């Protein structure tokens, strides 16, 4: 009972900090987050506002890169998805540090698993294990890029990541020329509308395939 009381007190304090330290729009964005992401905010109060700002910037720039057609148009499982996650972790690492950035990435993936269990979609698709493994790989790539090159400018990060994607250093999900998901054997992935599966047959491949 004492532990529960302390936990509720902590939640109240954190909520008060969020209401007083963030604008109305930011508070709304907080409540749009998944449970694991909200918990990350609770445990990183002094970094969360920067994290939200960086995330908004990353989404804007990713949309701009998508409109240039320099990668592809697949916001889930494609090159532009790989760019988004690696760029997100790179910019977060520069802003709030590698450890906090990666822990936010993990919280996001936990949120995706919760969405899977509820049958909810992200970027038009229900999350699954191959997509989560892809995100995790690309998240780590972005964080490692900054660890090895901490002084890269934003433009240099963007160009380096695009080049790395073209060189096959990141990961995407295998597709047919028409855009359908393929297994590692090159066969179409069978989707059953009556069954939602976490461990699908989608195949993780280098980003230049």
Language-model segments: what does each one mean?
Residues 1-7:
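Bacterial N-terminal signal peptides that target proteins for export
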Residues 3, 20-209:
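Intrinsically disordered, low-complexity, mixed-charge
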